[in-house]
Amino acid sequence: MKIKVKLPDGKEKEYDRGITPAEIAKELGVKKAIGAVVNGELWDLKRPIENDCELRLVTLEDPEAPEFYRHTMAHILAQAVMRIYGKENVKLGIGPTIENGFYYDFDIKNGRLTEEDLPKIEQEMKKIIKENLPIERKEISKEEARKLFNNQPYKLELIEEIEGDRVTIYRQGEFVDLCRGPHLPSTGIVKHFKLLSVSGAYWRGSEKNPMLTRVYGTAFAKKEDLDNYLKFLEEAQRRDHRKLGPHLELFMLNTEYAPGMPFFLPKGVVVLNELMKFSRELHRERGYQEIFTPLIMNEQLWKISGHWDHYAENMYFIEKDEERYAVKPMNCPGHILVYKSRTVSYRDLPLRFFEFGRVHRYERSGVLHGLMRVRSFTQDDAHIFCTPGQIEEEILGVLDLINTIYSQFGFTYRVELSTMPEDHMGDEAIWEKATTALKNALERAGLSYKVNEGEGAFYGPKIDFHIRDSIGREWQCATIQLDFMMPEKFNVTYIGPDNKEHRAVMIHRAIYGSLERFFGILIEHFAGAFPTWLAPIQVAVIPISEKHNDGAEKIAKRISQEGFRVFFDNRRETLGYRIRQAQTQKIPYMIILGDKELESGKISVRTRTGKEIKDVDLEHFVETLRNEVLSRKLELLMEG
């Protein structure tokens, strides 16, 4: 029987059913093929093709290649661990690819791996790569699989959850794994890898299950790419907010008494207040009204909103006076109650409510991560209530606000628009009109965007913003979400020109997203060296010796009186130590004062990067500092 295969150049060819991409690659002269994409699915090079399809061969240069070779590298890792520790002593978990790498989970009898074990595992992996073992894909019955993995309890659990009667296994040498693939044709194709770290991970992510040992690694087709990535990881580690935050006395975490709930220290609160002050100024200019809604509200509210049915496992509850209350996981129901507290006319719209609302959401302890993944956080939440005809202009206004805020921190960003899914609620005509309004606003704002067809929430289309930090990482922060569900559930209406009730449109939006998470991103973006307007301490005044203390203190007070955050460092430490301390604390400016400065009335200024500016008039410095802070400059003006 023949099948038709359509190639990327549009040509169709007929082949015998069961032909493999490897045979097609040989015919086409593509010697470097490592796999294929068949009807959009990643496909092993030696896997037979049974039906008509579109086919594109994959080489190591293609964007799909890492999925093949990193998946194979995860199997090489597992094979190496079983060789070293003994097949009978190692129970295998799962070993998927992840962004920029892979991992494998192990349950090892009589002990756990540590990072000290990684070099010997790498050496064994190199041997397996050198052996260049052929990798064979095979479909077997579940009964055969149960016998094959009879000493692998985690694999047996996975087998029972797979639909159908057959499963896929992969074999390389003596190693066999339950796996969907895809994989390389053999173990020797990609040689450039590095094992990165070891951590604990509960089986299936549940604290009720055994703790396994997770080994992370990465792999690249080219050594140069691997080396560059390892340098990137070093830089990311240097910027890690979990290290910098406590070092700079910005925040602390207490996993014993408040897991996932950060404590912000005085210096951190300064930064948070500056972020909120900046945001409030912009919101006031744009006609937003700030409100504050209760942290705890009756269960009936959450039943109406749907959170009770669909989100209860992520919520915290309180029972008092035979009434049940929930700590709010979201701000929107509270904003709706404010809207509904009076009759709203079409003349009142749009109404823009804004809140720095503290919310609580339960997250498993295993996924908590510094400020990035927490259980208690503050959202810069706003809800816009408007008529259908006002959607486009309101979205345009939000886009401008987002751009203004992100530009202030030096962020670039990319935009994604997610449209109506199959399981949507509401009339399709309303969806189409709303989606068109979002597209028009994006185009009027001059923003390029990617469309994710059918990936919107069931209650409305949305726009997501992914900001890029100073080392190129992306973070999803701002969201603009149209909501057709909440106005229905809460009967959110306005009185129209016809004196009748009409359904209002509700737009959710957040820009920082989580204030805590945004703070963490900023710490890493600036490597702790905040621009002066954000810096917890803006100026350190350092007398050279005790005899200069009085004069230095007067200068410190003069600068402080102008509203700047000043640290007068007259500690009985060496001058060099105090300067180094100011630099490690990332203080933008240091004023060094000795005999010469106090006699001349001129100051010596040193920036945190080490640049020295001598004979500076104090009033000139104050004025420069004022301009730098008021205009929220990213750079230090005294370095210009």
Curated annotation (Swiss-Prot):
GO terms for molecular function: ATP binding; metal ion binding; threonine-tRNA ligase activity; tRNA binding. Zn(2+) binds at residues 332, 383, 508. Its EC number is 6.1.1.3. Residues 240-531 are annotated as: Catalytic. Residues 1-59 form the TGS domain. Signal peptide: none annotated. It is an enzyme of class 6 (ligase). Its cofactor is Zn(2+). Its main location: cytoplasm. Pfam families: HGTP_anticodon, TGS, tRNA-synt_2b, tRNA_SAD. The keyword Ribosomal protein does not apply. InterPro entries: aa-tRNA-synt_IIb, aa-tRNA-synth_II, aa-tRNA-synth_II/BPL/LPL, Anticodon-bd, Anticodon-bd_dom_sf, Beta-grasp_dom_sf, TGS, TGS-like. It is found in: Cytoplasm. It catalyses: tRNA(Thr) + L-threonine + ATP = L-threonyl-tRNA(Thr) + AMP + diphosphate + H(+). One of its GO terms (cellular component) is cytoplasm. Binds 1 zinc ion per subunit. GO terms for biological process: threonyl-tRNA aminoacylation. Keywords: Aminoacyl-tRNA synthetase, ATP-binding, Cytoplasm, Ligase, Metal-binding, Nucleotide-binding, Protein biosynthesis, RNA-binding, tRNA-binding, Zinc. Catalyzes the attachment of threonine to tRNA(Thr) in a two-step reaction: L-threonine is first activated by ATP to form Thr-AMP and then transferred to the acceptor end of tRNA(Thr). Also edits incorrectly charged L-seryl-tRNA(Thr). PANTHER family: THREONINE--TRNA LIGASE, CHLOROPLASTIC_MITOCHONDRIAL 2, THREONINE-TRNA LIGASE. Homodimer. Belongs to the class-II aminoacyl-tRNA synthetase family. This is Threonine--tRNA ligase. It comes from Thermotoga sp. (strain RQ2).
